[in-house]
Amino acid sequence: MNLGCIEIHPWNSRVNDYDHCNKMDLIETEECGLNYPDFIVFDLDPYINIDNKNESKEPAYSLAAFRTTVEIALGLEDIFDELNIKSYVKTSGKTGLHIFLPVINMYTYKQTREFARVISQILNKRNPGQITTEWKTTDRKGKVFLDYNQNSIGKTLASVFSTRPVEDATVSVPLKWEELVDIIPTDFTINTVPDLYMRKIDPWKDILSHKQNLEEILERVSDFEV
């Protein structure tokens, strides 16, 4: 707060023993655990309305573009269901969606990123021409950007219930998968969210109780039919 930050962007990994690891020469060592994430993440953003002349411009919000992103996200949920993977979804607080898979923190970022890449390939084959993983913004036009590279040490996403620095002060909110088809992300603001979530059960409340074994999942992926 003393830095004037509006957004909260936590890492997907944590130190095992803060008192021991809170030293610059130890913090990045294997024993401290920062290279072993608790989550595999997928970042979905609709690049339906962008200007080719501005490579750095983020996509403008539109409900139609968001609905397209929801369709892709539900396709991703189908894959997770078929593979018996527990997954959690939230709005990004801006134009897209974030999907989290809780995993046992014994796998490196390199391993979790490779897993996310394989899942992204499966999703792309099921939705030809609708998804892109291109890094150059202008190459994403008209498609939903699926970013699996967020599974890298030091990469961050806005946290659950983080406010975003936009005009309406929208908030990244946790959802049930079945809620996706009805929600409008701009409805979730710093004015509406507190009362709304006082009256409902947090759909992410048990996320840390469902850490999954990636090796068991990979066995199912190897036999998976696209």
Give the location of each predicted region:
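C-terminal accessory nucleic-acid interaction domains of nucleic acid-metabolism proteins
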Residues: 2-40, 46-66, 70, 75, ...
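Short glycine-rich loop/turn motifs
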Residues: 37-39, 86, 96
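Active-site palm subdomain of RNA-directed nucleic acid polymerases
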Residues: 77-90
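Short beta-strand
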Residues: 87-93, 134-138
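Short, conserved phosphate-binding/catalytic loop or strand-edge motifs used
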Residues: 92-101
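Catalytic palm subdomain of template-directed nucleic-acid polymerases
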Residues: 100-112
